[in-house]
Regions:
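Acidic catalytic motifs of isoprenoid enzymes
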Residues: 1-141
């Protein structure tokens, strides 16, 4: 996923074009569109994913876990839902697929703390860190 604003919005346009049934020439976008149709992905899952990727451009930190919830749904929980659908799992598994996606995102947050701070991003909510008597990491601002 592109980190730059222009690249991201160009990607979103190609995605929308592909979802309207038109080929884009972008193998990733066209293949996802085909997979999405074949596995009946819910459009709101992909919309949530794209919203979270946009938040990587527009939001630099989250005050509380509640503030982070929308980002987590789109950045990770829907990935679990996509995987459950690809694997043909029953919808009863969907809550667990969401939890697994969220857990993996927490691992990513921990792994990428240094890089995210260099990019001016902080995913661990400051208010919740204070509740745990942990100091918030500085983003240099």
């Amino acid at each position: 996923m592109p980190q730059d604003t222009e690249g991201f919005y160009s990607f979103v346009e190609r995605y929308r074009t592909a979802m309207s049934g038109e080929r884009t020439g972008d193998i990733v976008v066209d293949s996802f569109s085909e997979l999405s149709a074949r596995k009946s992905f819910r459009r709101e899952w992909t919309d949530a994913f794209l919203k979270s990727m946009e938040m990587d451009i527009t939001v630099s930190d989250y005050g509380t876990m509640k503030d982070l919830d929308e980002y987590l749904f789109g950045s990770s929980e829907v990935v679990g839902l996509f995987m459950a659908r690809i694997m043909g799992l029953d919808e009863d598994s969907y809550p667990y697929a969401r939890y697994l996606g969220r857990a993996m995102q927490y691992v990513n947050f921990i792994r990428d703390i240094s890089e995210d701070l260099q990019l001016g991003r902080l995913y661990f909510p400051g208010r919740n860190l204070k509740d745990l008597t942990l100091k918030a990491w500085s983003t240099g601002r």
